[in-house]
Each structure stands twice: as structure tokens, then as C-alpha cells.
């Protein structure tokens, strides 16, 4: 029996030293004066009257008295816990292994969350001196709240770096301020996101040795993965507004993947000439199938922040469902010869058939020959 548990915290290693509100205004004013100087010197053309550049040129940036460190609104101290438990037992005829684990993490970006639990069970039983059975199975459950717009220039951290420090994070209505020169980093935290995975899989096998040096093995394995992803921009939020009025947007998707593999092999391994020649011959058959299924629906015009599911949407404006399946059947063989642990010769072939290809082109043969010499 084994058990371990740990807890840790996470901080950003090198936090950027950003300008405060007054420093930002001073830099802007210096740039404005340099721009005017270049125009007067004929280096740059004057901007069109009434354009954004023209208005900015005429008007110095106001001293708002606001000093916002946007990173304070985006970052936090992250935390991670890790718990592991395992049990193993067995002897000559039977073996068992069981484990359960959980990793829970809150990232340094606010609302970022990751929680995964795993269970594994391996059992092997020797029936006779020639026959044994085994089962390897597992289950995984993942629940996460991903960073909104992750891997995107508009994700919270990037926006916090770009946002002007002389502007307030919230407006008079208590919502994230929209009067910024870039996206408000706080808009990301208005979105409700849920992403969940479940995976279950197992491998059942039997190994039989009818005579010395000959091993027959049959196995059946499979896995099922399902995912549910949901996001909601509530109507009474900046993200959920339309033309400044409450509206709301929702999106829901599911993914289901199934896979199974059947494999049968016969392996013969024998030494000749007082062990100088080793012959290893393998022949087998396998069949594998994959199935992929996904769908999504999105809608808008929600009556309330509390009604988050698409059944409450006033309009369903998009949707799709998709299914794909493919199979691969194989027959294979391999013969390997080794002399004095120094000279090696291998001959192999595969005869594969795939459902991906058109009728008359589904099957192909793939022979191979290789030779080797072990230097030392």
C-alpha cells in the first residue's frame, strides 16, 4: 500500500514592471510633442482634420487621476494539490494492482481551473502452467475551466499588458469599463465556461503456451471518450451585450469517440546449434475500428443571467452534427534470425485493408527485409 499527498503554490516568476497612470500620460505627451515636431519639420504629413490622429494631436491626454495596475485584476496565487493511492498484491499465480489519484490546480490566471481524477485496475491470473488471463482497465475524469481566449492575443494576461493604466477597470454601472483603447481584461472573466472529459478503457487478454517455445496470445481492447463543453455570456454583462443592451450568447458541444482493437498472435522462439542460432517467428491478425461523433448548437437572446442553457435562448442560430467511422484490418508476419548475437536478418510483411480507400484500392501488401551486424 502506498499513499502520497502534496500541496504547492504557484506565482508568476518575473512580473512585468508596467507604467502607472501618470507615467503613461507623460509618455503619451512626449510622443504627441515629437509627432508635432516631425510635422513642423516636414518629416511627416499632417493628419486629416477630424481623424483620430488629428484629434489626438490637438488634445493632450487628460490627467484622469486613475492608476490601475491591470495585472492585479488578472493574476492570483495559484495552488495545486496532488493525492495518490495505490495497492498491489500477488504471488506466483495471481497479481493485482489498484490505484486512484487526483490532481487539482488553480492557475495563476483568475478562474483558470484544472481537476483530473484517475482510477486504474490491473489483474492477472494464472489458470494452469500453460494458460493465464489478464485485465488492464482505467477511468479518467477531467473537469476544467479553461482561460477564455487562451492562445489568443485577447486573452486576459495579454490584455492586461496592453490596457491603459490611467483608465478605471469598472464603469459607473459596475460592469467592466468599455472605454479603453484595447479590450478590457475583465471581459474574459464574465464568460462562464465548463469543459469536462470522461474516458474509460480496458484491455482483456489471454496467453497460452501449448508447447515449449510457442506462445499464443489473444487480446481485446477498447476505449470510450466523451466530452461536454459549454460556454455562456450572460445578457447583463459586457460580453453578452448587443448594441449596449442585454442580449446573451450560448454555445454547447459534445464529442464521443469510441475505439476497439482485436489482436491474435502466435510467436515461436527457439535456439539451434547450441544457442548460436536464434529463430523468432511471429504471425498474427488484427482488426481496429474508430468512431468519431460530435455536435454543437449555439444560440442568443437569453432572458436572464440565471438561465444559462440553450433551451432558454430566444434564437438558435447555428448547429451541426457529424459522424465518422473507419476500420483497419491487418495480417502480418515476421521472421528474425540471429547468429552468435552478432549477425541479424529480418523478413516481414503486412497485408492491410483500410476502409478509408475506395473499392478496389482498400488492400495493400508491405514487405520488408533488413540485415544488421552488431559491432560490439
Model-derived regions: residue spans:
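Transmembrane beta-strand segments that form the barrel wall of outer-membrane beta-barrel proteins
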Residues: 5, 100-106, 345-354
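Outer-membrane beta-barrel channels and translocator barrels
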Residues: 80, 91-92, 128-130, 209-211, ...
